[in-house]
Amino acid sequence: MLSREFLTENIDHIEKIADEIDAEDLSLLLEMLSSKIDLERYSAFLALKFKSEKSDMLYSHWDSLVKRMRDENSYQRSIGIMLISENVRWDKQEKFDDIVDEFLSHCEDRKFITSRQTVQSIKN
């Protein structure tokens, strides 16, 4: 079972750590995405991003990613957008079809960084 401390202290090895993430770790990682501590939030984001490249484990939390994409906070919007992008590959239920216009609207987000991250995430 992962801990906040382990993730933040081992951020340089997060891609390898992501390979070991199991379903029990997801709730902690999703909670950490809302952390006010940048290193915690970023560690959780990276772990989930790398896990999503190889596994559909996060796809069952699709609705929480969409909720983040709709958040007032630009950090949360960016996290939601980038993780949605990583999980579209697992979208057998075609949930992305329901949000594609909203997703693409963030190419013109009021925060430039969110716009940039949306455009960059389209390649996934």
Question: What would you call each of these model-derived segments?
Answer:
Residues E20-S34, D56-R68, Q93-H106:
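Amphipathic alpha-helical scaffolding segments comprising HEAT/armadillo-like alpha-solenoid repeats
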Residues M1-E31:
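N-terminal "cap/leader" segments of large eukaryotic alpha-helical scaffolds
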Residues L7-I11, A23, D38-L39, S74-Y75, ...:
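Alpha-helix N-cap/helix-start positions at coil->helix boundaries
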Residues K49-F50, S85, K123-N124:
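Structural signature of alpha-helical solenoid repeat scaffolds
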Residues E102-N124:
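A contiguous pocket-lining binding segment that forms or flanks enzyme active sites
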Residues E53-K54, R89-W90:
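Alpha-solenoid helical repeat scaffolds
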Residues L2-S3, S34-I37, R70-N73, S105-D109:
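Solenoid-like repeat scaffolds
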